[in-house]
Design a protein with these regions (language model features):
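Structure-specific DNA junction-binding interface
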Residues: 1-97
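Short, positively charged, Gly/Tyr-enriched micro-motifs
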Residues: 100
């Protein structure tokens, strides 16, 4: 089953949440949030664009780095960067923040 835009957006939102917990640069956090919003509302399926070789970084708000991450998600079903963030933040803290 191909990865849907909504799933990619969800991953980018989680990355933004975890970066926020870590106190990362606000511009970086905003880039992930804006990309998630753009992807969520984007009319074309990103996996189809990748399959046909269309460049993702031509989408407003999606730079080369985020385009590579989208390709990784579509091709592998997950994002190594997200796994790294999850491993650095205690699950209990994530759970606590999800409740509030």
């Amino acid at each position: 089953v191909p990865v849907q835009n909504s799933e990619i957006a969800q991953i980018f939102n989680e990355v933004a949440d975890l970066l926020e917990i870590e106190g990362a640069n606000q511009f970086r956090i905003r880039a992930y949030r804006n990309a998630a919003r753009t992807i969520e509302g984007y009319p074309n399926r990103l996996y189809e664009m990748i399959e046909s070789g269309e460049p993702l970084d031509e989408i407003s708000g999606i730079g080369e780095d985020l385009a590579q991450k989208i390709e990784e998600i579509v091709e592998t079903g997950n994002l190594v960067f997200l796994e790294e963030l999850r491993s650095r933040i205690p699950p209990s803290l994530i759970k606590l923040l999800n409740i509030s």
